[in-house]
UniProtKB/Swiss-Prot annotation:
<comment type="similarity">
    <text>Belongs to the class-I aminoacyl-tRNA synthetase family. MetG type 1 subfamily.</text>
</comment>
<dbReference type="GO" id="GO:0005524">
    <property type="term" value="F:ATP binding"/>
</dbReference>
<dbReference type="Pfam" id="PF09334">
    <property type="entry name" value="tRNA-synt_1g"/>
</dbReference>
<dbReference type="InterPro" id="IPR023458">
    <property type="entry name" value="Met-tRNA_ligase_1"/>
</dbReference>
<comment type="function">
    <text>Is required not only for elongation of protein synthesis but also for the initiation of all mRNA translation through initiator tRNA(fMet) aminoacylation.</text>
</comment>
<feature type="binding site">
    <location>
        <position position="353"/>
    </location>
    <ligand>
        <name>ATP</name>
    </ligand>
</feature>
<dbReference type="InterPro" id="IPR015413">
    <property type="entry name" value="Methionyl/Leucyl_tRNA_Synth"/>
</dbReference>
<dbReference type="GO" id="GO:0046872">
    <property type="term" value="F:metal ion binding"/>
</dbReference>
<keyword id="KW-0547">Nucleotide-binding</keyword>
<keyword id="KW-0862">Zinc</keyword>
<feature type="short sequence motif" description="'KMSKS' region">
    <location>
        <begin position="350"/>
        <end position="354"/>
    </location>
</feature>
<keyword id="KW-0067">ATP-binding</keyword>
<keyword id="KW-0030">Aminoacyl-tRNA synthetase</keyword>
<dbReference type="InterPro" id="IPR014758">
    <property type="entry name" value="Met-tRNA_synth"/>
</dbReference>
<dbReference type="GO" id="GO:0006431">
    <property type="term" value="P:methionyl-tRNA aminoacylation"/>
</dbReference>
<feature type="binding site">
    <location>
        <position position="146"/>
    </location>
    <ligand>
        <name>Zn(2+)</name>
    </ligand>
</feature>
<protein>
    <recommendedName>
        <fullName>Methionine--tRNA ligase</fullName>
        <ecNumber>6.1.1.10</ecNumber>
    </recommendedName>
</protein>
Length: 600
């Protein structure tokens, strides 16, 4: 058994999540976490809403709310979205907890004490019309590296490089379009050059494993070529105070949102441990060198997870050129793998809430089954290349693959057993065809599991559905309905073998399709939970008593979760006439209705 940290990118609390978001961080992390638990590993899956930074400050001002009120609203909305999708977080929390503030400030103090956080003067943007500081995310212009017109003052989303606002060509305010004025200001900078050698050594060990996705590895290696100090504080009054004398009482200086957000993986683990009753439980995932950690996100966040976060960890541990000693958390593990997906587009266009090119998770879940969306993302998502979501393909895949493939196999098998036997029959003497089929389904555990562990989920679900096709083919060729009277014992053997094969397929598909896995289990007389879903729970802050919702759950293997293996079906288990597992869609109606919504 290995302790496996599943660190899931923190959705920003400025609105509901759209399907492009969950295609990058949500479904891939959940499929991996569910499989790893079933395979016997001790998984801790953590995340939460990212609630600091300029966008929330500006949006709250526009809506007549405080930043905390806006964060409270969307913390709940996002938690509900992810709950509906069935993402099995051990803890989904938020970055405005007192616990998170304490962990972040401790990280900053130690990084500063070790000599990797250096105060220096730089240039900050000011709005000429208001005289107020214009945070870097609200300055845009032409990227000096790739020439993209629309780069932000902290990062270019086109090439992924980090920037300073003053580096942009033709800078302008995203709020009112005016040209900002740049004035001198003082900030703390993370000394990346002092950490460059250690970062390069770590990244080389990752490259040597041969496991990282080529695009992620290449991008991360390219970052090493331009290592310069990066500002980790901002001129803003919404965020975590700088925990140093002379700075912490300054209302206009706060820690950079990306400095604090990535520390959330650690603070969420600490909060989970505190809520579990063992304050030190988090250490098994963070300080044990044998533990593994996998970070899931979209490709626009690679920089922060393969450069900034490892640099913070190295600086905290004192492993850069300036030396130093770890703080009270001890030596913290560096990421095992950064699992970044490409982008999902919609009907050939980039997602854009402001332009109405968006499909929110909550809207999909209100009209369609959650496993239909999970299936599309798993089978056709942006794993190694950008992919496009169309309503035509979504509805067609739902009908031809889920309904006509997997759902049809479940329904016809349960119906045949219910009609002809009423219970799972015992098997008589098996034929070569029977043994071949059972070898195919049992062999799927190694193949599908290997694909999931290698973050090749499209191949994994494709192989699982290929096995489903083999079972459907077997049932059609054996024609048990024709031999009820002439050879009832053979009919029972065929139905037993098919029931066993369906059980195996259910397990193979359960990391991808947890909602329907439970339905299939119950359709064949199963009791108890085989595919646990998360709980949306109301809690209070452990330190200041403020209420907020979290996602959590009980995902213990052997108690609520089966082992990743074939489980013998039990003869005599009653089987009643089933109800369809999946809902067939009217493809033309879905396309017309959904495209009409986009145009309204």
């Amino acid at each position: 058994m290995t302790h496996v940290l599943s660190a899931v990118a923190w959705p920003y609390a400025n609105g509901p999540r759209h399907i492009g978001h969950v295609a990058g961080f949500g479904v891939p992390s959940d499929v991996f976490s569910r499989y790893m638990r079933m395979a016997g590993h001790d998984v801790l899956m953590v995340s939460g809403t990212d609630e600091h930074g300029t966008p929330i400050l500006v949006q709250a001002e526009q809506e007549g709310l405080t930043p905390q009120q806006l964060a409270d609203r969307y913390n709940r909305v996002i938690a509900e979205d992810l709950h509906g999708l069935g993402l099995s977080y051990d803890l989904f929390t938020r970055t405005t907890t007192a616990n998170h503030y304490a962990v972040v400030q401790e990280m900053f103090r130690t990084v500063h004490r070790n000599g990797y956080m250096v105060a220096r003067k730089g240039m900050g943007a000011i709005s000429p019309s208001t005289g107020r500081t214009l945070p870097d995310r609200y300055v845009e212009g032409t990227c000096p590296i790739c020439g993209y017109d629309g780069a932000r003052g902290d990062q270019c989303d086109n090439c992924g490089n980090q920037l300073d606002a003053i580096e942009l060509k033709n800078p302008r305010s995203r709020i009112n379009g005016e040209t900002p004025v740049f004035v001198e200001t003082e900030h703390f900078y993370l000394d990346l050059p002092a950490l460059a050698e250690a970062l390069g050594s770590w990244l080389q060990t990752r490259a040597d494993t041969g496991r990282w996705r080529p695009n992620v590895l290449k991008f991360s290696q390219n970052l090493l070529a331009d290592m310069k100090p990066r500002a980790m504080t901002r001129d803003i009054d919404w965020g975590i105070p700088v925990p140093l004398e002379g700075w912490e009482d300054n209302p206009a200086k706060r820690l950079y949102v990306w400095f604090d957000a990535v520390i959330g993986y650690l603070s969420a683990s600490v909060e989970w441990a505190r809520r579990s009753g063992d304050d030190d439980a988090w250490k098994a995932w963070w300080t044990d060198p044998a533990a593994e950690s996998y970070y899931f996100m979209g490709k626009d966040n690679i920089t922060f997870h393969s450069q900034i976060w490892p640099a913070e960890l190295l600086a905290y541990d004192g492993r850069g050129s300036a030396g130093g000693q770890p703080g009270p958390f001890g030596n913290l593990n560096l990421p095992t793998e950064v699992v970044a997906s490409e982008f999902l587009t919609m009907e050939g266009k980039q997602f854009s809430s402001s332009r109405g090119v968006v499909i929110y998770v909550r809207d999909v879940l209100a009209r369609y089954q959650p496993d239909a969306l999970r299936y599309f993302i798993s089978a056709a998502g942006p794993e190694n290349n950008d992919s496009d979501f169309t309503w035509q393909e979504f509805a067609t895949r739902t009908n031809s693959e889920l309904v006509a493939g997997w759902g049809n196999l479940v329904n016809r098998t349960a119906s045949l057993i219910a009609k002809n036997v009423g219970e799972i029959p015992a098997a008589g003497e098996l034929t070569d065809a029977d043994r071949d089929l059972l070898a195919t389904t049992s062999g799927g555990f190694s193949t599908v599991g290997g694909f999931i562990e290698a973050h090749r989920q499209r191949a994994g679900i494709g192989e699982a559905m290929r096995v489903v096709g083999e079972v459907n083919k077997y049932l059609t060729e054996q024609e048990p309905w024709k031999i009820k009277n002439s050879d009832p014992e053979r009919m029972k053997s065929v139905l037993h073998v098919t029931a066993q094969a369906v059980s195996d397929c259910r397990t193979l598909l359960s990391p991808f399709l947890p909602h329907s896995a439970q339905k299939v289990h119950q359709a064949f007389g199963g009791v108890g939970t085989v595919s646990p879903l998360p709980e949306l729970r109301e809690v209070t802050d452990l330190d200041d008593g403020r209420p907020y919702p979290v996602l959590t759950g009980d995902y213990r293997r052997g108690e609520t979760l089966p082992e990743w293996a074939s489980h013998p079906v039990v003869p005599g288990t009653p089987v009643a006439a089933p109800t369809p597992v999946f809902t067939k869609l009217d493809v033309a109606a879905v396309v017309e209705e959904e495209l009409g919504r986009l145009q309204r």
